[in-house]
């Protein structure tokens, strides 16, 4: 494959060289390789609507099957040629993901570049996303046991802790939500969509950038000002935790009552010592209510308004594993967005 000829129309020579060198360094790394367009087109039945399994701010995702029988997921990135943001984001995602290996992270298996079009190839996750399991209707909704939910939360926390504390430079995901948690055939959770991730060195405490993420999970300081740190991910994880334990949406919209925020509801029940009332009623009867309540308290620790009081993800893992007592940490007022109109997003920023 003539790598340079495919990229020359849209990539600067500097970016092209960086991508080429990165690819050549990694092409034999655990099967990571370049796919031809015909391979991906054939695998996805011509990127048919029937094979489409997801869509977000950075593009659409299709399921496919290669000639050898292996199932894959293909993400077709949306590229804005004028701004070239697509190219930079593609390179960042490619170079970071192809070098990351953790059991709770989706692995990038390869890519294809066709002029200004970029395609990323991943392993296909048999059980779709956590959002599909929690929010599906009728037969599409899975009845996840309490043990399954615990395992999912611990897995997600471990994946985030790896990105925050073991990858150098560390990675802030920026879009932790149920639809970005994929479940394999054993329901092991895999963090997906690093197209929204930013890499920055340890000497930087934060990076101000365009807001990317989903309303309901966004940390207030990030949503309003674009002030981004690892603690922004911790907040989003806390919301996800509350969502999984309660089985409730992060934000409910009611014509009569207006916006209803899960974080505020949990905080209100915490103050009246009634957290047990928020445990998902569809959970099996074998659930230990005390344990579920402790999990919700961990969620509240993660969504505290004061970012310095939010635990690091490794500490959250320790608490979820009951290696650290939640009682050792005082829970303070949570942060939440009072008015969605306060969110300052640059033009073109997606909220999907």
Protein language model regions, located:
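Conserved eukaryotic protein kinase-like
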Residues: 3-352
């Amino acid at each position: 494959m003539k790598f340079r000829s495919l990229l020359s129309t849209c990539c600067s020579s500097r970016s092209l060289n960086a991508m080429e060198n990165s690819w050549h360094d990694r092409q034999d790394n655990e099967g990571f390789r370049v796919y031809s367009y015909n391979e991906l087109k054939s695998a996805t039945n011509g990127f048919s609507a029937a094979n489409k399994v997801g869509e977000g701010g950075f593009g659409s995702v299709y399921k496919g099957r290669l000639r050898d029988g292996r199932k894959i997921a293909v993400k077709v990135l949306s590229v804005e040629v004028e701004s070239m943001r697509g190219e930079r984001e593609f390179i960042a995602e490619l170079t970071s993901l192809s070098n990351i290996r953790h059991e709770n992270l989706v692995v990038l298996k390869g890519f294809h570049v066709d002029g200004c079009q970029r395609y990323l190839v991943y392993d296909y996750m048999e059980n779709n996303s956590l959002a599909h399991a929690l929010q599906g209707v009728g037969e599409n909704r899975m009845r996840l046991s309490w043990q399954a939910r615990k395992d999912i939360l611990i897995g997600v926390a471990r994946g985030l802790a790896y990105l925050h504390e073991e990858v150098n430079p560390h990675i802030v995901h920026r879009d932790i939500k149920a639809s970005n948690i994929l479940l394999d055939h054993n329901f092991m959770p895999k963090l997906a969509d690093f197209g929204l991730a930013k890499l920055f060195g340890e000497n930087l405490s934060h990076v101000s950038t365009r807001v990317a993420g989903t309303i309901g999970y966004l940390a207030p300081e990030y949503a309003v000002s674009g002030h981004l740190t690892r603690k922004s991910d911790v907040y989003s994880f806390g919301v996800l935790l509350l969502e999984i334990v309660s089985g409730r949406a992060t934000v409910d919209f009611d014509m009569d009552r207006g916006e209803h925020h899960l974080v505020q509801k949990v905080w209100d029940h915490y103050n009246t010592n009634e957290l047990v009332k928020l445990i998902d009623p569809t959970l099996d009867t074998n659930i230990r209510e005390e344990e579920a309540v402790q999990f919700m308290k961990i969620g509240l620790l993660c969504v505290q308004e004061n970012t310095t009081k939010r635990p690091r993800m490794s500490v959250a893992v320790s608490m979820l594993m009951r290696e650290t007592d939640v009682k050792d940490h005082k829970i303070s007022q949570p942060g939440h967005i009072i008015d969605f109109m306060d969110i300052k997003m640059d033009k073109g920023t997606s909220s999907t």
